[in-house]
Amino acid sequence: MAQEKKRRRFAVCLAAYNGMVFMVEQIESILLQSNVDIQVFISVDQSIDGTEARLAEWALSESRLTLLPFGQRFGGAGPNFYRLLRDVDLSGFDYLSFADQDDLWHPEKLWRAQCLMTKKSALGYSSNFTAFWPTGEARLVNKAWPQRTWDFLFESAGPGCTYVLHSSLAIPLQQLVRNADKNLLRVDYHDWLAYAFARYHNFPWVIDTWSSMQYRQHAHNQIGVNAGWRSFWLRVRKILSGYGFEQSLLIADLVQASALPVVQRGLGGGRLGYLWLALRATQCRRKRIDQMWFFISCVLLALFKPADRGDA
């Protein structure tokens, strides 16, 4: 009985879309979590492969699955997760976790997060992960680089599917989502927003060196591992378009960080602002190679960013 009283309750928020190929295996790995009590809340972007029907049937026999009303069209994972954050009742839960539809969780994923968060007095958690491909290739992806002064405005803490948020962080984040204006839907990455909110408002965050899950790579991934030259150049083109810094500005506004010097003098400073950021690259990204690319990107934007996109 004493052991049962120590079990913590986790609300797992899963966004699905045409997920029949991998979804069942993923949900089964979530339901096998050890030493914790879970409830999986699922929001399905309007699908055509029978995802809704399969989940509805499954929920009849599995009380740990809660399905949000079907029928809405979100058009991306971000808006779907915002719907979950807005609509799921988090009262009575100790932690919130995000889940994609096509990965595989380690049986102790949530338990390990809870233990490390308690040890480090952290309220936000993310971790390394293992990317794997249909060919059988697997690769550990390290996200546990030291946090920097402003990294939260330029990158997430890792994939949202590794995140665990204590309720004292999750509930204020939920209030932000519920109260946000239409600009929320312009932020494509719910995980980046969550990390920025936590860091700016001084909620302690820990990034675990342990790989908590297997992150499936396939042709239909909305966001995958940056592997291969094609993927690399797609990201370079997105950087040079100014897209990343536009996302940074939106996030800074939503989390009320717009008064920071990195926003006022850097992101809001036009071409000179990009040079200002370039000189502070080590404070804007965690990983050394990313700091180098950040520096190069800022210099290129200062030189070549089209004037008709504005200074932002």
Predicted regions mapped to residue ranges:
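Conserved donor NDP-sugar-binding/catalytic core segment of glycosyltransferases
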Residues: 104, 108-139
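Catalytic donor-sugar/metal-binding loop of nucleotide-sugar-dependent glycosyltransferases
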Residues: 196-214
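Short, well-formed alpha-helical segments that are part of the catalytic scaffolds
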Residues: 19-32
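A conserved acidic beta->alpha catalytic loop
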Residues: 44-53, 74
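Acidic donor-binding loop at a coil-to-helix junction in glycosyltransferase catalytic cores
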Residues: 183-196
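Glycine-rich, basic loop-to-helix element that forms the pyrophosphate-binding segment
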Residues: 71-90
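Short beta-strand/loop segment that forms part of the nucleotide-sugar
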Residues: 38-46, 68-70
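Short beta-strand-to-loop acidic/aromatic patch adjacent to the donor-nucleotide binding site
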Residues: 93-102
